[in-house]
Amino acid sequence: PSNCIGCGHCVEVCSAHAISFGDAGVSIDRSRCTVCLACANGCFANALRPVARLMTVGEVLAEVEKDKGFYDNTGGGLTVSGGEVLAHAKFAGALIDAAAARGISSCVDTSGFGSSRALLDLVSRPGVTDVLFDIKAVDDEVHREFVGVSVGPVLANVRLLSADEAILPKITVRMPLIAGVNDSEAAIRAAGDIVRECGIRRITLLPYHALGIAKARNIGSQQQEFTAPSDERVAEIKRYFEDDVGARTEVLGKL
């Protein structure tokens, strides 16, 4: 990290021996790191710093309540997201209930890949007014290649939620658009067929951006870089979902 002053304190406090110091500076073996945060908490130069912290439901709610005035004026509220919210479903459910008790509504943002029971439990809670459901690709081979898992559970879950008349109006399908990956005519029409079948009436298109590249680099990871479809192609996709599928469609990002 550019702020490093070469004091070597991080090497001394790392009980996992995941940090070494040489001519090239600090090197971190991520496979050995236990995320104890001793290095970051003791870094005088702030070259290593924690990007997250453990919190209780009450502590999170205290942060959320700081903006309650804005929620009251705009109709907004709390969004539980991730990562994947289903990886922390119990905590998310407790947070949603606590927020509802304070008069704060919640939105569940999910990839749809996880326990159907846990997902249904979360979105059925009285405090949940919106569900953002990601559909990245409908073709299973494409989904496995770029997401790493089968799209089967995702499609099963979106069908499960949309079959519930109380949940259906809450759902907005969100689709990242990546040139050469999921923006072909066949890919878009396959997604449109699912949306039409489920009776979902809201779609948000998310043209690809590279903001995650720097974040991945900062944690010693690598992320493949893609490109967004052209503005013209995004406009065509938007018209298709509006005119052929009958869904209100918005684009987040440059068009």
Regions found by a protein language model. Give the residues of each.
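Iron-sulfur cluster-binding cysteine motifs and their immediate structural context
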Residues: 9-28, 38-54
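A structural motif corresponding to the C-terminal lobe/cap of the Radical SAM core domain
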Residues: 193, 199-201, 216-242
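Conserved dinucleotide-binding and phosphotransfer motif residues
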Residues: 17, 46, 98-102, 244-245
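Conserved AdoMet/S-adenosylmethionine-binding subsite of the radical SAM
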Residues: 58-214
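FAD-binding FR-type
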Residues: 32, 53-59
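N-terminal pre-triad scaffold of radical SAM enzymes
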Residues: 1-9, 26-35, 79
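C-terminal accessory regions of radical SAM enzymes
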Residues: 185-189, 193-198, 206, 235-255
